[in-house]
Amino acid sequence: MIIEDVHYRVVFDSRGNETVECEVVAGEVVAKAMAPSGASTGSGEAVVVSPYRYEEIEEEVSKAIIGMSVFDQESVDEALRELDGTDNFSRIGGNFAITASLAVAKAAAEILGLPLYAYVGGVFAKELPYPLGNVIGGGRHAEGSTSIQEFLVIPVGAKTFFEAQRANAAVHKQLKKIFKERGIFAAKGDEGAWAAQISDEQAFEILSEAIQRVEDELGVKVRMGIDVAATELWDGERYVYSDRKLTTEEQIAYMAELADRYDLLYIEDPLHEKDFEGFAELTKQVKCMVCGDDIFVTNPEIIKKGIEVGAANTVLIKPNQNGTLSGTAKAVKIAKDNGYSVVVSHRSGETEDETLAHLAVAFNAKLIKTGVVGGERISKLNELIRIEELMDKPRMVMI
């Protein structure tokens, strides 16, 4: 079955910003994919270009991939890279490339009568990731709130994905109650997490109380994690928090202290995106998942560099950072072949596209980071509940 038509349109993301959707036609099948966007971005990720270039880029992409087999994903993705001609999709845009790439994969899966996770992951796609839920937000996602960008929860005691998401939603609801009880005004940030004028220390304390209430109510063990987004704190010499300025050595010590004090399961981007040695040193000191996002940007070659020095032990996977499904799959394979865990992630500017849920299962990710509330987040979480029903003997992944 060949690709017969490619069409782009401008749509809107969860922040009300314009983004791009790609539609691929193959036979009777029409498949669509939309591009998300990030507020906190790594310098090495695929470039996003204006969605309003859609007519020009549609013409180029159409010439490049129409007539190709919808089942030859690697060749389609290579054609997109060759069309662009740069190493970061700075000409046609990672947003245009990833949507075409994913739409082709979705079309192929539909033609075969397979869910996307089974088409991409094959017979080994049998486990569900735990939802990594952002429940208190700050940093670039909620100005005037905490210095740490995200305070996260992981319902490790859940036996099903439905139970896991219910626990995360319960923590989110308890936080609302606690803020109200304490007279603290809290609004929702970009990802639906609560944003309030509180310190990082207060956030840890309030979240600990919310988790305890949920564990008592539901009987499900919940662990805590953080996304520091440290590149946003780094001024070239120090990590600048609202109440302190830390050298690299002090930042590593602070992260290790937080991991121990709050029994953190997960720390994302604890140091700035160029500090491979700092990542490696912290990874040696703590027993939790140390995840690289801005440092790796879903780039296979950069991930290899990190592996060589022992930077982190977990890789955050964002397909739009890479630009193609094949490139994203390569990044996943390199990470897993070297003993690193994988976390599949949304962006702060999201859409209702549910593709990410399928990729998390296909890549056997430990966690899926896609928020807790909000239609653009729930679309992925509800899709995972549907996937759980589709599986013959579904089980949660081992963390």
UniProtKB/Swiss-Prot annotation:
Its EC number is 4.2.1.11. The keyword Lyase applies. It comes from the Archaea. GO terms for molecular function: magnesium ion binding; phosphopyruvate hydratase activity. The keyword Secreted applies. Pathway: Carbohydrate degradation; glycolysis; pyruvate from D-glyceraldehyde 3-phosphate: step 4/5. (2R)-2-phosphoglycerate binds at residues 149, 318, 347-348, 369. It catalyses: (2R)-2-phosphoglycerate = phosphoenolpyruvate + H2O. GO terms for cellular component: cell surface; extracellular region; phosphopyruvate hydratase complex. Keywords: Cytoplasm, Glycolysis, Lyase, Magnesium, Metal-binding, Secreted. Its cofactor is Mg(2+). The active site is at 191 (proton donor), 318 (proton acceptor). GO terms for biological process: glycolytic process. Mg(2+) binds at residues 227, 268, 293. InterPro entries: Enolase (IPR000941), Enolase-like_C_sf (IPR036849), Enolase-like_N (IPR029017), Enolase_C (IPR020810), Enolase_CS (IPR020809), Enolase_N (IPR020811). SUPFAM superfamilies: Enolase C-terminal domain-like, Enolase N-terminal domain-like. Belongs to the enolase family. Catalyzes the reversible conversion of 2-phosphoglycerate (2-PG) into phosphoenolpyruvate (PEP). It is essential for the degradation of carbohydrates via glycolysis. This is Enolase. It comes from Archaeoglobus fulgidus (strain ATCC 49558 / DSM 4304 / JCM 9628 / NBRC 100126 / VC-16). The lineage of its organism: Archaea, Methanobacteriati, Methanobacteriota, Archaeoglobi, Archaeoglobales.
